[in-house]
Every structure is written in C-alpha cells, then in structure tokens.
UniProtKB/Swiss-Prot annotation:
Pfam families, A to Z: CLIC-like_N, GST_C_2
Gene behind the chain: Clic3
Protein name per UniProt: Chloride intracellular channel protein 3
Highest taxon of the lineage: Eukaryota
Catalytic activity: chloride(in) = chloride(out)
Entry GO terms, CC: chloride channel complex; cytoplasm; extracellular matrix; extracellular region; nuclear body; nucleus; plasma membrane
UniProt xrefs under PANTHER family: CHLORIDE INTRACELLULAR CHANNEL 3, CHLORIDE INTRACELLULAR CHANNEL PROTEIN 6-RELATED
Native species: Mus musculus
C-alpha cells in the first residue's frame, strides 16, 4: 500500500452521535483495521439524522462503508477480503485462520439467538433456548478440542487452552464471531437472565480473552447501546 493511500471507515454512531454504536459488522471491520496496524480515519455516522456525510459518494448505502483512496466499498465480507488481500505480508500481518473449521465455528449461534430473543410466544421460549444452547455447546466443543499445532507440541493434550478460535492469535474468524457472541451474552443476560452458562467454560474463556484484547475492547459499543437496540424487539416476560 502506498504511503499516500487514504483509508476511511464509516461506522454507525452511538446514541450520543459521536462514539461507536451497536453494529457488529462495523465492529468487525474496525477490528480488522486495528489488527492490520494501518493508519486510517474513523468516521461515526448518526443514522437517525440525514446522512449528509455519505450522500456524495455512497447514497443509500448501509454501514459500514470503506473509502479506499476515493474508491467506495460497501459489502462487509468483500471489504474484509479486500483488506486481507491488499494489506498483506510482509508489510501487514495476515489475519486468515490456519484452520478452515475456524471460519464456520459458531456461525449458527446468532440466528438461534435472534429466534429466541425476538420470540413473541412464551410457550416456545424453552425450545428456542435449547436450540441456542446446542449451538453454543458446539462452539464450546470446538474451542475445547486441541488443534493440530497444539497436538504437535503436546501429543497427549486432551483439552485446548487456546484463547481464540484458531489459536492464541486473533484472526478474521474472531472478528466475525465475537461481536455477535458478545451481543448474545449481553442481551440474554439482561432480558432473560440467561447469560452464556458458566458450564460452557471454553466459550466463557473465549469471551474473557476477547475482553482483554484491546482491539476488541476498544471497538465494543457500550452495553446500553446494545440493549437499547434490542429493547423494541424483545417481548416482556
């Protein structure tokens, strides 16, 4: 990347109109850029008001939006792929996971969570929660199973102690899953008094490890932002 290249990321603003708001896709790309270590400008956009800041180059587009030397990119997955391809070694770290399974671990959790938390029929709550719990348990099993490189170092290792999906390094897989997993834990704990269970110790360790990672902690919206976003969709119990 040329030294004069300009990178600008537009993300959803919080209720105060300035800090980072509730938008897992925005947090995902924000983390990618921080992990790459590339200079960029972050612009928070108040979506409740006229999007004057976007009208000249991305009218009608959904956030997040990347502006790369004047070139507009609006699809989150395509932006992520573009950044990984453009900002690669030796100048920037690769964030691609080593293991293909890391890319899909936990990918059904958010769908199960949405069905549970937005369910209008109380008698269906338990069945929907059990589906969410099974999805979380599958993630726990993946995080518990030693990866090949761990077994190469410790052939008799029975349980992984890694911090993240693919090892001890944050990857694109974590950038995708963790913002959503944090929402699941925050929203279920507040509205249903059902945080991710302590028995799923590897998932809890995973979340705790994320909160110790400055790139995740710094990009997280306040819990109040997340709860306010879900308040209209959650039926009281």
């Amino acid at each position: 990347m040329a030294e004069t290249t300009k990178l600008q990321l537009f993300v959803k603003a919080s209720e105060d109109g300035e800090s980072v708001g509730h938008c897992p896709s925005c947090q995902r790309l924000f983390m990618v850029l921080l992990l790459k270590g590339v200079p960029f400008t972050l612009t928070t956009v108040d979506t409740r008001r006229a999007l004057d800041v976007l009208k000249d180059f991305a009218p009608g587009s959904q956030l997040p939006i990347l502006l790369y030397d004047g070139d507009v990119k609006t699809d989150t997955l395509q932006i992520e792929e573009f950044l990984e391809e453009t900002l690669g070694p030796p100048d920037f770290p690769s964030l691609a996971p080593r293991y293909r399974e890391s890319n899909t671990a936990g990918n059904d959790i958010f769908h199960k969570f949405s069905a549970f938390i937005k369910n209008p029929v109380p008698t269906q709550d338990n069945a929907l929660y059990q589906q969410l719990l099974r999805a979380l348990t599958r993630l726990d099993s993946y995080l518990r199973a030693p990866l090949d490189h761990e077994l190469a170092q410790e052939p008799h290792l029975r349980e992984s102690h890694r911090r993240f999906l693919d090892g001890d390094q944050f990857t694109l897989a974590d950038c995708s899953l963790l913002p959503k997993l944090h929402i699941v834990d925050t929203v279920c704990a507040h509205f249903r008094q059902l945080p991710i269970p302590a028995e799923l110790s590897c998932v809890r360790r995973y979340l705790d490890s994320a909160l110790q990672k400055k790139e995740f902690k710094y990009t997280c919206p306040h819990s109040a932002e997340i709860l306010a976003a879900y308040q209209p969709a959650v039926h009281p119990r």
